[in-house]
Amino acid sequence: MRSGYTLPVFACAGAIAALHWLRQRQSLQVGLVDLIEPAQMAEVPIEQVAGLSENMALAITRSDPGDNIDLTKNTPIWAVVEWGQGGGEQVTIKGGEGIGKQVNADNRAAIYSYAQRLLQANLTRLLAPEESIIVTIILPEGRSLAVRTSNSAFGVVEGLSLLGTTGISQPLSSPDQLDAFRSELQHKASLYASLVFCIGENGLDLARKIGINAEKLVKTANWLGPMLVEAEALGVKEILLFGYHGKLMKLAGGIFHTHHHLADGRREVLATHCALGGLSKQDIEIVFHAPTAEAALKHLKALDSSTGSDWVNQVYSAIAETIDSRCQEYMQSHSSRGTAATICGSILFDRDRKIIVKSKTACNLMGNLC
């Protein structure tokens, strides 16, 4: 299967082409981008370049994530570059139309650290010391595409994020992607007895912010099952699962590959634990038919607020304990020894990146992870 590039790479290539027009008044056919992560160069086709004024140019690229299930495939990325006034930052990066806003960070543009590094590194080297530019990234289809994502669950509204830690976009079903994650796990398992599994970038980011040692973080994407089995085989003593509740709760239903194209089960997990906890039939039905896990959580919060109950804590504590036990069972069933020595705990957070619950085991593990 064919890999491609992540959105920040196309944004960067467009910015390089727009800057080239400002300097040379010529259109580039290909933007050459240093990916940084990994250490290799990428040749990105440039669709169009136009001068908007003497001091401003626009270049357009088109997203190609490879053979990946990605709604950004073929979406256009615009990069507008204009000369700055000098002084301050050499490269100022802004988010235009279609770039999401972080509601929990003063509506700052959702252009995250890798994209920032990529743009800064590739553009600064093309500038003289006294020169400065302002780069505005625009996703014309970003606002409409964002409706089909879970971005709002992570506090990003009105558009898409320039997210990621690498320039390469591997197909979700690609063995190469799993091999890369396993390789990182093998390296970190040789250094630490306790590790933290994060499905995606939001988990990695929040884990760092609450004080977890970044060196102990391992990205799993949706491959939680194989990664748990690998960790157990490598002799990892403790694993903390740290993730968005709408993803991580799938493990409570025995779903160990969490991509939505393969399985869901969230409403079944939520409704089951509500029923086991004694929630009324009417409220269970509301939870079961909620359009998202976030909407179901909101209903439980409303119940707690109006009645003084403790349904959020009760239901989610039960889900977290089920996640822990299902993970133990999964590792044991796949262990060559017939038993699993690895201990699992779980922490679930909501759309506002606020922690909903920590399992009992997770509370015990935290001291070894910070």
From Swiss-Prot:
Pathway per its UniProt entry is: Cofactor biosynthesis; adenosylcobalamin biosynthesis; cob(II)yrinate a,c-diamide from sirohydrochlorin (anaerobic route): step 6/10
Write out the GO MF terms: cobalt-precorrin-5B C1-methyltransferase activity
Its domain of life reads Bacteria
Query: Any one Gene Ontology biological process term?
Result: anaerobic cobalamin biosynthetic process
A Pfam family it matches? CbiD
Q: What is its EC number?
A: 2.1.1.195
Q: What chemistry does it catalyse, as a reaction equation?
A: Co-precorrin-5B + S-adenosyl-L-methionine = Co-precorrin-6A + S-adenosyl-L-homocysteine
Task: List the keywords (alphabetical).
Answer: Cobalamin biosynthesis, Methyltransferase, S-adenosyl-L-methionine, Transferase
List where this protein forms a coiled coil. none
Q: What class of enzyme is it?
A: transferase
Q: What Gene3D superfamilies does this protein's entry cite?
A: CbiD-like
Q: Which family does it belong to?
A: Belongs to the CbiD family.
Entry's NCBIfam families? cbiD (TIGR00312)
Protein name per its UniProtKB record: Cobalt-precorrin-5B C(1)-methyltransferase
Name of the coding gene: cbiD
